[in-house]
């Protein structure tokens, strides 16, 4: 029992995707799940498309905890109730640090969810959503157009080359 807990701890920390897939998460190809992301108590109700990045501290919530109060009412009418919702994330999606995705939400393809956003409603394809509650703030095309002059081509650099490049930018 203790050995299993130790293995689970290290697997969750260093091999998050494999850990959550064992628990039932459906995950497409080329996904990145960062340490500290949580798929809650029902990861089998969550589907991630291809090329999805889930950052540190992201929470997927598949149930409504408010039923706890109803179960506590004296009439016993609700003593065994729960309320669940699936969560579906499309292809090519980035979910920012500490975002919360609530039950029943569908996030479309080619979306960015901002850091700290609380997503309570569906997000359509090709959108950026942020805020509490999350709302669409612009399209992917608008984002690309707005930042195209600022994009830096650093993904093919080594970490040393990238550091040197970025530090030289600061000097200009």
Where are these regions (language model features)?
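Terminal amphipathic alpha-helical/low-complexity segments used for targeting or macromolecular assembly
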Residues: 1-24, 29-30, 66-67, 132-172
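Structural motif
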Residues: 29, 90-91, 106-110, 123-127
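Hydrophobic, membrane-inserted alpha-helices
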Residues: 31-33, 113
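Beta-rich strand-turn-strand
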Residues: 97-112, 117-121
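Short arginine-rich
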Residues: 122-126, 153-156
């Amino acid at each position: 029992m203790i050995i299993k807990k130790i293995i689970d701890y290290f697997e969750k920390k260093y091999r998050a995707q494999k850990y959550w897939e064992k628990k039932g998460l459906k995950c497409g190809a080329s996904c990145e799940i960062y340490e500290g992301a949580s798929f809650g108590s029902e990861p089998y109700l969550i589907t991630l498309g291809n090329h999805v990045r889930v950052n540190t501290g992201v929470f997927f919530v598949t149930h409504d905890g408010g039923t706890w109060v109803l179960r506590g009412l004296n009439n016993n009418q609700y003593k065994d109730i729960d309320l669940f919702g699936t969560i579906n994330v499309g292809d090519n999606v980035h979910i920012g640090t500490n975002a919360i995705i609530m039950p029943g939400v569908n996030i479309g393809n080619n979306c960015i969810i901002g850091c700290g956003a609380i997503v309570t409603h569906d997000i359509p394809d090709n959108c950026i959503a942020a805020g509490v509650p999350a709302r669409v703030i612009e399209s992917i095309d608008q984002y690309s157009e707005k930042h195209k002059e600022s994009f830096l081509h650093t993904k093919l650099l080594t970490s040393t080359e990238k550091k040197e490049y970025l530090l030289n930018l600061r000097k200009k």
